[in-house]
Amino acid sequence: MANGANRVDLDGKPIQPLTICMIGAGGFIGSHLCEKLLTETPHKVLALDVYNDKIKHLLEPDTVEWSGRIQFHRINIKHDSRLEGLVKMADLIINLAAICTPADYNTRPLDTIYSNFIDALPVVKYCSENNKRLIHFSTCEVYGKTIGSFLPKDHPLRDDPAFYVLKEDISPCIFGSIEKQRWSYACAKQLIERLVYAEGAENGLEFTIVRPFNWIGPRMDFIPGIDGPSEGVPRVLACFSNNLLRREPLKLVDGGESQRTFVYINDAIEAVLLMIENPERANGHIFNVGNPNNEVTVRQLAEMMTEVYAKVSGEGAIESPTVDVSSKEFYGEGYDDSDKRIPDMTIINRQLGWNPKTSLWDLLESTLTYQHRTYAEAVKKATSKPVAS
């Protein structure tokens, strides 16, 4: 239930109700953030997106207690004259819009660059010109490769955190060669970050930049052939979920050796709410939002997901639960990757007092329970062969 009474920020100051223009509100992160804002705060949401499937439960029926606090506007920010007017109506703009699926980075590099840089330019411009605060969602991909990845594999410094832990104010952004179009996303995201930062420095734009480190949970991406294109390749959680639902081996790109950290969407949304409601502490900062305690290789993630799914579904694992594939075979020509992505949490902990809470096992159990409940029957119907007459 929304509770506007006696809400105070981290410094004990009363929190005033805001009108928030959320661009990309219909996506994975946007849907969870809308839920949080509507059920636990008095804030109003102008929800902008091309699709609203993931927030329909918040828009219908009109009798829900927050019906007067959310408006959905079907907008493609590429070419819609309504965007500036909606920005002017708001106190805060949150830009979540992006192409953020690795399979697209080197197969659709132009769309990736336009979506993440060119299409975001008007949002930054309107915020700066109209003195509106902006929370811009970037990505941990802006860090690119770690310094340690350039050392020999047996070099002792590869285990030194100084060579792989990623810090917002210190770590360099290291990308692959131009032919490796996988970095089109990271470059576009880094450039829009630099523009936002420059608008703050030169024109006084109030901004916060968020760098998510693998946020996962219910409603992430899609299951190919069920609520997304059959040929689509979603991110790793949905890819592995799709394999588990179809009782297929989980595909490990280049052996699944890359190391990643994963944070539960509910924990991450708590961090975003702190940014929204503590502008004096968040303005001008870039925040890593991840969980360094949940570090695994992609192979270990696959093994854990197989174990968790067997528990929540009651189905035993298949005989060969994983299969190795090359990155060229899976993603196409021009793919490249980083070896590790481990966030340093010093700044967000100091400014906002935020720390993630949910273990990898618990977040996978919650997420895969949702995946099984939501998709198992549909996948079964889609994969069952018609009975011969």
Curated annotation (Swiss-Prot):
Keywords: Cell wall biogenesis/degradation, Cytoplasm, Lyase, NAD
A Pfam short name: Epimerase
Tissue expr: Widely expressed with stronger expression in leaves and stems, and lower levels in flowers, siliques, pistils, pollen and roots.
Cell compartment(s), UniProt: Cytoplasm
Protein's organism: Arabidopsis thaliana
Activity-pH behavior: Optimum pH is 8.0.
Any Gene Ontology biological process: nucleotide-sugar biosynthetic process
Reaction(s) the record says it catalyses: UDP-alpha-D-glucuronate + H(+) = UDP-alpha-D-xylose + CO2; UDP-alpha-D-glucuronate + H(+) = UDP-alpha-D-apiose + CO2
InterPro entries: Arna-like_SDR_e, Epimerase_deHydtase, Lipid_A_modif_metabolic_enz, NAD(P)-bd_dom_sf
Highest classification ranks of the organism: Eukaryota, Viridiplantae, Streptophyta, Embryophyta, Tracheophyta
Name of the molecule in the record: UDP-D-apiose/UDP-D-xylose synthase 1
